[in-house]
């Protein structure tokens, strides 16, 4: 399935039904009073969060959503039927913005959570409401009001507690496959991961923790280079960052600094989020190299530093122990 995490759509609530002009016409009431009913409410457009959905792909094909109009009032003071609501399912993690004002309308994170994005219009009043001592037979009624109309921007931010970050080909997908049941595409070249992957890693207690394998970031990601904005958005909700650095790289310390600079430039508190620095691919490096790089990194960061291998699974148990400790602290 294609992963789409951005969409722009149009929503419109239904128009309220018109009130009507009517009078009582019973056989034995020759001068019946006003009896025009009110119009019904227009339906509303309502978003419903669904944990079974993983993408905004459907909004590439359906961009306009309109609820039903309310029915006009009836004689004998009968109120018209309300218009049917338009229910639109979205993935959990969807943020909804007013496209024109940039106002945040809602953040749908819980399964079943709802958000009214375009309210239906109120039904018009029938002529019975205009009866007065001065006017015993009002011959006018009010039309229903138009429903709300909006253009929306939808952004999907993955709901994961741990975000795995690093430069392309740092081994993020291999690590994800080793830690969880996720089976991301893996190959020995940069940019294998073009969309975020989610995986659930089980604690010893049996509880699951969601990890997100974020596509490789590059220098300039905070400016949108290499789809950086789209990728960085998905780690905004994480509680912990697992920063993978390829120890076999020509300059692992510089690789670490590049990602840190991108987090700082993007803002939103990402650079201050708790981190674990994992020097990956220890199966292809010696202990002396590890200690040398670790020593340099300790001058740049107070985060825990550990050597691991996603291929041989070296150090993964120790890594997870640190993850659980930081999440529980």
Curated annotation (Swiss-Prot):
Metal-binding among keywords: yes
Obg domain mapped to chain residues: 1-159
GO terms classed as biological process: ribosome biogenesis
UniProt feature coiled coil, ranges: none
Residues reported to bind Mg(2+): 173, 193
UniProt xrefs under CDD domains: Obg
OBG-type G domain boundaries: 160-328
Keywords: Cytoplasm, GTP-binding, Hydrolase, Magnesium, Metal-binding, Nucleotide-binding
EC number in record: 3.6.5.-
Pfam families, A to Z: GTP1_OBG, MMR_HSR1
GO molecular function: GTP binding; GTPase activity; magnesium ion binding
Keyword check for DNA-binding: no
UniProt-annotated location(s): Cytoplasm
Record: residues binding GTP: 166-173, 191-195, 213-216, 280-283, 309-311
Listed GO CC annotations: cytoplasm
Annotated InterPro entries: G_OBG (IPR031167), GTP-bd (IPR006073), GTP-bd_Obg/CgtA (IPR014100), GTP1-OBG_CS (IPR006074), GTP1_OBG_dom (IPR006169), GTP1_OBG_dom_sf (IPR036726), OBG_GTPase (IPR045086), P-loop_NTPase (IPR027417)
Cofactor(s) the record lists: Mg(2+)
Role: An essential GTPase which binds GTP, GDP and possibly (p)ppGpp with moderate affinity, with high nucleotide exchange rates and a fairly low GTP hydrolysis rate. Plays a role in control of the cell cycle, stress response, ribosome biogenesis and in those bacteria that undergo differentiation, in morphogenesis control.
Record note on quaternary structure: Monomer.
Family: Belongs to the TRAFAC class OBG-HflX-like GTPase superfamily. OBG GTPase family.
The protein, known as: GTPase Obg
Gene this protein is translated from: obg
């Amino acid at each position: 399935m294609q992963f789409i995490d951005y969409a722009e759509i149009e929503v419109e609530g239904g128009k309220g039904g018109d009130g009507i002009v009517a009078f009582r016409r019973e056989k034995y009431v020759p001068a019946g009073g006003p009896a025009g009913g009110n119009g019904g409410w227009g339906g509303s457009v309502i978003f419903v969060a669904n944990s079974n959905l993983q993408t905004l792909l459907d909004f590439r094909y359906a961009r306009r959503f309109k609820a039903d109009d309310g029915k006009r009032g009836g004689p004998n003071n009968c109120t018209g039927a309300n218009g049917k609501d338009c229910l639109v399912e979205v993935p959990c993690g969807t943020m909804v913005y007013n496209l024109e004002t940039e106002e945040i309308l809602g953040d749908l994170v819980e399964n079943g959570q709802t958000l009214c994005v375009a309210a239906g219009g109120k039904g018009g009043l029938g002529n019975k409401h205009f009866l007065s001592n001065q006017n015993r037979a009002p011959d006018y009624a009010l039309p229903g009001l138009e429903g709300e109309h909006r253009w929306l921007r939808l952004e999907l931010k993955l709901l994961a507690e741990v975000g795995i970050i690093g430069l392309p080909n740092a081994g993020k997908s291999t690590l994800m496959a080793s830690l969880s049941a996720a089976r991301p595409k893996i190959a020995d070249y940069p940019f294998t991961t073009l969309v975020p992957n989610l995986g659930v890693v089980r604690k010893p207690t049996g509880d699951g923790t969601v990890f997100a394998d974020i596509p490789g970031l590059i220098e300039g990601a905070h400016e949108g280079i290499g789809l950086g904005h789209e990728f960085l958005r998905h780690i905004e909700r994480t509680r912990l960052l697992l920063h993978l650095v390829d120890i076999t790289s020509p300059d692992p310390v510089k690789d670490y600094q590049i990602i840190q600079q991108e987090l700082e430039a993007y803002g939103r508190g990402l650079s201050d989020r708790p981190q674990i620095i994992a020097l990956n691919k220890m199966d292809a490096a010696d202990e002396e190299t590890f200690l040398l790089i670790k020593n340099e990194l300790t001058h740049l960061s107070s985060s825990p530093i550990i050597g691991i291998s996603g291929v041989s699974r070296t150090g993964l148990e120790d890594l997870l122990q640190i993850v659980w400790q930081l999440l529980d602290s």
